[in-house]
Design a protein with these regions (language model features):
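Inter-lobe coupling/hinge segments of SF2-like helicase ATPases
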Residues: 1-246
Length: 247
């Protein structure tokens, strides 16, 4: 395929960061579309543009969570901007609420009720394994606890970035096929996941996630006509973290 791209035999190339590597050459690159723009560095985007011969290609960047530099360019740079400010037909806004320690059991009960309706849920943790330095819950430990103590009788799956790609793909496919009611995960599901039947995103230690991460995680639900809910399990934390969660 690399040789066919170089010879111009392929009109449309869809890829990842791998398209930036040196041995990928384009015969006549006319348009670059970068999705999830905040995941690409400035130099990476520049190197991709440099693969084009003159004239320079048109560039379309897309993101739901623009980084500060991108926001500055919309004000001070020479950019044309298009804004998609409405949901696709049939979808409703995701309801977001903060869950305190006292309300944790109530929140778990709510998740179970959603599953009893035939829906599915994500439960996201900031760590894969327990850490001696951080007093935080981990995905691997909590997956077992939730399965044995909280969501007994339900199918609970585990997904994290340290798994091999084939295993991650298998688990995600099984979740899409509704072989799991609940998927316990880390930030690995932040982008590229589409499960219309999932209506709950529960984020443990939400104060440990950045605003863009929270927004991306919430975007994994609300992809059907069913009302969806984002539950932010958070301790008081700093003023900055409280403001981030409130946003």
């Amino acid at each position: 395929n690399i040789e066919r791209i170089k010879q111009g035999e392929i009109d449309l190339v869809i890829g990842t960061h791998a398209l930036i590597q040196q041995d990928v050459e384009f015969k006549k690159l006319g348009l670059i579309v970068i999705d999830e723009q905040h995941k690409f560095g400035v130099m990476q985007r520049t190197r991709l543009r440099q693969k084009a011969h003159k004239p320079q290609p048109d560039v379309l960047v897309m993101t739901a969570t623009p980084i500060p530099r991108s926001l500055s360019l919309t004000v001070f740079g020479d950019l044309d901007i298009s804004t998609i400010d409405e949901l696709p037909p049939g979808r409703t806004p995701v309801e977001t609420c903060r869950v305190t320690a006292k309300k944790e059991n109530d929140a778990y009960g709510f998740i179970r009720k959603e599953i009893e309706k035939g829906r599915q849920a994500f439960v996201v943790f900031p760590l894969v394994d327990e850490s001696a330095k951080l007093d935080l819950k981990s995905a691997t430990v909590e997956a077992e606890r939730l399965k044995d103590e909280v969501f007994t009788g339900l199918n609970v799956g585990l997904l994290h970035g340290q798994m091999k790609s084939d295993l991650k793909d298998l688990i995600m496919t099984d979740f899409i096929k509704h072989k799991y009611d609940i998927l316990v995960s880390t930030i690995v599901i932040e982008v590229g996941i589409d499960v219309p039947n999932a209506t709950v995103m529960a984020i443990e230690h939400a104060e440990r996630f950045g605003l863009a991460q929270l927004h991306q995680l919430r975007g994994r639900i609300g992809r059907s006509s069913h009302q969806s809910y984002c539950l932010l399990f958070a301790t008081p934390g700093s003023l900055e973290s409280r403001q981030r969660i409130a946003t």
